[in-house]
Structure formats: structure tokens, C-alpha cells
Amino acid sequence: MYDIIIRNGRVIDPQNKFDAKADVAIYNGKIVGVGDYQNAESDRVLDAAGHIVTPGLIDAHAHLWPLTKMGISTECTCIPSAVTTAIDAGSAGWATYETSRGFINTCKVRVKTLVNVSPMGLPCNGYLENVDPDYLGGVYEREIEQLFDRYRGELIGIKLRVNTGVIKDMGEKLSLIHI
């Protein structure tokens, strides 16, 4: 007896090079089999005829923190698109990351984060990030390193938005930063 059987869908599993019409059996929240489960019993049956059944997708560049102008809701955008993991690409800065964790921890999708080298993160209504290395240097580099030490499983990299509106004439100075 299974908890859920997803029947009659086109199952695409790139990792196992599987692409065929099949059923998916789920028990205790885990996929326990892919194949013919037409005669198997389950508490719930979902008919996926005409639909694709696939492992959760990864959005590798999202802005999920709703306190930034670009922020989006994971429930409204990720879940309907089969995204189960999203990488927030620098919405929070190193000085605001700990505040953003409150939101991130409530998301229904798994979130990993690139922390912005700008202390405040991405701009809100006309404020551009401060990425001047003269401002970031010394003590701030240590604070960024300590943030990564504290949240090793959550933070996966650093975001530096490189466009002329943000970096202006600091390109050479920025290329010399090592964090």
C-alpha cells in the first residue's frame, strides 16, 4: 500500500535517463518506484495523463527576498513552475542576510543564497548598491567570512552586480578584491 500513486504521466528523470509514460509510487514522502502501478493500492491517486512528472527543478537565479524591489513570492512563482529549489542571487547583503533568513526559513521551497557584497543588498527604489572596495575592505571582509562560517549550509557564494550603473569607474579596484 502506497500513500500516493501518480498515474499515466510522462515521467522525465534526466539523472536516470528515463523518459516514458509511467506511474510513480510514493510512500512516507519518498518516491519508492517508477513503473507500472496500475493495480497497486494507495491512499490517494493522481491522474497525470497529458502531464509531465519530473523531479523538482532548480531556479539558479531568483530574487526571493520580498523586501527588495525585485523580490518575488516563492509560492506564486516557484511552486507552480515545479521549482523546488531556488538560489537567491544576492537580494540580501552581508549586513541584512540574517534578517532575510526569517523569510527564507518560511519558504516552501529549498533556498540557497548568494550574499551581496553590498551591505544592504539589492536596491529599493533608486538606491544603488555600495560596492566601493574602499568601503568594503578590512573589517567588512572579516564580517563576510564570519557570515559564511555561521551559515555554511545556506550561503553558497557571493553576488557582485557588475553593470556601469553600480560599479561606475571602480572596475579595476573591484577586480583586486579577494574575499
Predicted regions, residues:
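Active-site gating/metal-coordination segments in enzymes
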Residues: 129-173
